[in-house]
């Protein structure tokens, strides 16, 4: 779970590993370890990060998970902004979004031409690119499958930030193409039946749910770390 911070951060300030001693950074490292343990029997190459509805913090979580996985020196990680309707990764990492995922999928650019380095060692991003009229069709295309295969050849792990599950079909399409999914849940806000509907949507896609990430839980004094 990710505890609530008093002030919202913007841009690179959102990335927890840039604040190594923060509680949030340590929480994401714990989540990374839990994901690794949950998939110890499989070769986890791709993770989808999604939520039930908008506003639960999935993009924040995807960016921070990618950053903590990249901290492992042997892992070269790619974060893909597959939320083609409301992309944010370019703003988080302060990179341009002139070309990106959509350009690759329609054949106007190559993966090598669109991947961008971040200030974090071993972490690269593929932004969304221009907003297309047909996001679901692009994400379900043969070109998307081919791109994922190409990414596997160049990166140890790819993390996809997708739209919310109950808003559009995009997340279900991607969940079927990735090795596991993480469902971000906004603490104290998202209703249980909404989360269960999202879980059902993943199951209908034959997706593997790695776990749920409870975001912005109010921290009690007794829950601070002690040494």
UniProtKB/Swiss-Prot annotation:
Name the SUPFAM superfamilies on file.
P-loop containing nucleoside triphosphate hydrolases
Gene Ontology MF terms in the entry: ATP binding; non-membrane spanning protein tyrosine kinase activity
| Key words of the record | ATP-binding, Kinase, Nucleotide-binding, Transferase, Tyrosine-protein kinase
E.C. numbers: 2.7.10.2
**What's one Pfam family the UniProt record gives for this protein?**
AAA_31
Q: Which reaction does it catalyse?
A: L-tyrosyl-[protein] + ATP = O-phospho-L-tyrosyl-[protein] + ADP + H(+)
Tell me which InterPro entries the record gives. AAA_dom (IPR025669), Bact_polysacc_biosynth/exp (IPR050445), P-loop_NTPase (IPR027417), Wzc-like_C (IPR005702)
> What PANTHER family has UniProt attached to this entry?
FERRIC ENTEROBACTIN TRANSPORT PROTEIN FEPE, TYROSINE-PROTEIN KINASE
Q: Which family does it belong to?
A: Belongs to the CpsD/CapB family.
Q: Can you say what this protein is called?
A: Putative tyrosine-protein kinase YveL
Origin organism of this chain?
Answer: Bacillus subtilis (strain 168)
């Amino acid at each position: 779970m990710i505890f609530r911070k008093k002030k919202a951060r913007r841009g690179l300030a959102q990335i927890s590993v840039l604040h190594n001693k923060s509680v949030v950074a340590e929480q994401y490292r714990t989540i990374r370890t839990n994901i690794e343990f949950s998939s110890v029997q499989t070769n986890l190459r791709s993770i989808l990060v999604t939520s039930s509805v908008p506003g639960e913090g999935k993009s924040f979580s995807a960016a921070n998970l990618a950053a903590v996985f990249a901290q492992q020196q042997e892992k070269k990680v790619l974060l893909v902004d597959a939320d083609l309707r409301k992309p944010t990764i370019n703003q988080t990492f302060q990179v341009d979004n002139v070309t990106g995922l959509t350009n690759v999928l329609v054949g106007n650019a190559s993966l090598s031409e669109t991947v961008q380095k971040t200030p974090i060692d071993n972490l690269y991003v593929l932004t969304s690119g221009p907003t297309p009229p047909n996001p679901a069709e692009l994400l379900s295309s043969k070109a998307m499958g081919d791109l994922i295969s190409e990414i596997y050849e160049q990166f140890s792990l790819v993390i996809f930030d997708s739209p919310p599950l109950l808003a559009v079909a995009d997340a279900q399409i991607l969940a079927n193409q990735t090795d596991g999914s993480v469902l971000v849940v906004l603490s104290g806000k998202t209703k249980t039946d909404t989360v269960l509907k999202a879980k059902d949507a993943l199951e209908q896609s034959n997706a593997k749910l790695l776990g749920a990430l409870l975001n912005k839980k109010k921290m009690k004094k007794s829950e601070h770390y002690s040494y």
